[in-house]
Amino acid sequence: MSRPAGGSRSQTIATWLALLGGPLGLHRFYLHGVGDRWGWSLWPPTLVGAYGVQRMRTLGQDDQIAWLLIPLLGLVIAATMLTAIVYGLTPDARWKTRFDPSGDAVSSPWLNVIGAVAALALGATALIASTAFMAQRFFEYQALQRSARPPAPADQTNSQRLRP
């Protein structure tokens, strides 16, 4: 995808947009323009995940649809935090070749590093929380399914049940 007319893009701004507005694709729109397909492709899973959060707040934690929707938001957040890390730690020469050929954009190396560190903390938190949430709900669902089954007759022992 090509960069929009008007040229120079700051590495610092791109890093912080990915950190603060990543799930909405703001960093992609800044670098590639409003017509960027990848930027718009972040909206559906973000909105679906936010809807899952809203469902859980409204209907409680027993809502099984929310179990499926909420991890999408966590995964989008983790993915965009990875993008912020990549942007923040990209070498200056490579960044200037790709996004700032005129060299006009001002970037602050320390703000890039701080943004990358913050993105690492936030992304790791989102990924771990999403994984823990999915695993907890999966095991709760399994326990619910086991408790719904009728118990085995009391007069049979384990050895009798295993015989053909």
Protein language model annotation of sequence segments:
Residues 2-15, 39-164:
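Transmembrane helix recognition focused on a "late"/terminal membrane span
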Residues 17-29:
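N-terminal signal-anchor/start-transfer transmembrane helix
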